[in-house]
From Swiss-Prot:
The keyword Cytoplasm applies. The keyword Protein biosynthesis applies. Belongs to the EF-Ts family. It comes from Streptococcus pneumoniae (strain Hungary19A-6). It comes from the Bacteria. PROSITE patterns: EF_TS_1 (PS01126), EF_TS_2 (PS01127). This is Elongation factor Ts.
Length: 346
C-alpha cells in the first residue's frame, strides 16, 4: 500500500476542496492515486448532495459582474447565513457571475452546462460545493443585460451582497447609473413604467390600499377624527383623458364655491392637479421606478430627475436573496437536532 503523506493529502485537498479526513480516507481507499481519489470524492459528493437536495436553501448571496457591454446579476443560495459568508462560497458566487456574463446563456439549463475555471460544468461545481461545504448550495437564477457603447451600466450590491442591481442609463454617466442602482436597491421597484403593470394587479393593489384606509379610519373614528376618503385610482394607466378632464372640472367648481377669483385659478389649478396625480398613482409609486420619489433628490420623481439631467433609464434588474422562497421556521432546538442528525448521516 502506498504511503499517504501529508503532502499527498494537501495536494488532494487543493484539487478537490475536500476536508483533511475526507481526503485522507479517499487516498487510503484508492491506494494513493490522486486522480482516482478525486473521482471517488466526486462520487461521494454527489451522494451527499442528493441527500441534501430536498432541503430549503433560502440564504445566500447575489453576484454582479460587468463584461464590456454585458452585465450579469445572479443569485446563489445556501441554507444558512453563516455559510453565505464562507470564503469558498463567496468565490463560487463571484466566479459564477463572471462565467454567466461571459457565456451569455439563454436559460438556467444552458447556464448549468457552462464550464467553470475548474473544468467542471457549473452544475457539477455546485454538487461539489454542496459536498465540500456541507450545506445545500444551489444556483437559483440570473439576468443578463446588454448595452450599447453610448450607454452606461450601474452595478451595485447592498447589505453584504444580499441585494444585487444592474441598471442601464442613456445619455448620462456611470455615476448616475450607480446612484440609480442604489435607489433601486432601496426602493424595490419591480418594473420601469406603469405601462408594464397588469390591469388586474393594479385593481388588486388598489383594493388593498383602500383596505388599509378602512383600518385607519376605524382608529380615527375612536378619536373623533374625520374619515379619509377611498382612493378611486391607483395608476396612471387608469387616468384617462376623461378622468383628468373631470378632475380639473371638479377643481374649478371647488374654487368657484370658495369664491376664488377666476384670474388666479391658473396659478392654483396646476398644484392641485399635481396633488390629484400623486394621490391617484399610489400603485405606480410602489412598483414602478419612474414614478418613485428619487432618494437622491426627494423633490422629484425618478422620471422628473432624469428629465432634468437629459438622461433616461433603459433597463434594470434587481435580485434580493430569498425572494419568493418559503423558508421553514424551525425553533432553535429543532435546528440543532437537525444539524447533528445531518452530521451523523454524512
Amino acid at each position: 500500500m502506498a504511503e499517504i503523506t501529508a503532502k499527498l493529502v494537501k495536494e488532494l485537498r487543493e484539487k478537490s476542496g475536500a476536508g483533511v479526513m475526507d481526503a485522507k480516507k479517499a487516498l487510503v481507499e484508492t491506494d494513493g492515486d490522486i486522480e482516482k481519489a478525486i473521482e471517488l470524492l466526486r462520487e461521494k459528493g454527489m451522494a451527499k448532495a442528493a441527500k441534501k437536495a430536498d432541503r430549503v436553501a433560502a440564504e445566500g448571496l447575489t453576484g454582479v459582474y460587468v463584461n464590456g457591454n454585458v452585465a450579469a446579476v445572479i443569485e446563489v443560495n445556501a441554507e444558512t447565513d453563516f455559510v453565505a459568508k464562507n470564503a469558498q462560497f463567496v468565490e463560487l458566487v463571484n466566479t459564477t457571475a463572471k462565467v454567466i456574463a461571459e457565456g451569455k446563456p439563454a436559460n438556467n439549463e444552458e447556464a448549468l452546462a457552462l464550464i467553470m475555471p475548474s473544468g467542471e460544468t457549473l452544475e457539477a461545481a455546485y454538487v461539489s460545493a454542496t459536498a465540500t461545504i456541507g450545506e445545500k448550495i444551489s444556483f437559483r437564477r440570473f439576468a443578463l443585460i446588454e448595452k450599447t457603447d453610448a450607454q452606461h451600466f450601474g452595478a451595485y450590491q447592498h447589505n453584504g451582497g444580499r441585494i444585487g442591481v444592474i441598471s442601464v442609463v442613456e445619455d448620462g454617466d456611470e455615476a448616475l447609473a450607480k446612484q440609480l442602482s442604489m435607489h433601486i436597491a432601496a426602493m424595490k421597484p419591480t418594473v420601469l413604467s406603469y405601462k408594464e403593470l397588469d390591469e388586474q394587479f393594479v385593481k388588486d393593489e388598489l383594493a388593498q390600499l383602500n383596505h388599509v384606509i378602512d383600518q385607519d379610519n376605524e382608529s380615527r373614528a375612536m378619536v373623533n377624527k374625520p374619515a379619509l376618503p377611498h382612493l378611486k385610482y391607483g395608476s396612471k394607466a387608469q387616468l384617462t383623458d376623461d378622468v383628468i378632464a373631470q378632475a380639473e372640472a371638479d377643481i374649478k367648481a371647488e374654487l368657484a364655491a370658495e369664491g376664488k377669483p377666476e384670474k388666479i385659478w391658473d396659478k392654483i389649478i396646476p398644484g392641485k392637479m399635481d396633488r390629484f396625480m400623486l394621490d391617484n398613482t399610489k400603485v405606480d409609486q410602489a412598483y414602478t421606478l419612474l414614478a418613485q420619489v428619487y432618494i437622491m433628490d426627494d423633490s422629484k420623481t425618478v422620471e422628473a430627475y432624469l428629465e432634468s439631467v437629459n438622461a433616461s433609464v433603459v433597463e434594470f434588474a434587481r435580485f434580493e436573496v430569498g425572494e419568493g422562497i418559503e423558508k421553514a421556521a424551525n425553533d432553535f432546538e429543532a435546528e440543532v437536532a437537525a444539524t447533528m442528525a445531518a452530521a451523523l448521516n454524512n
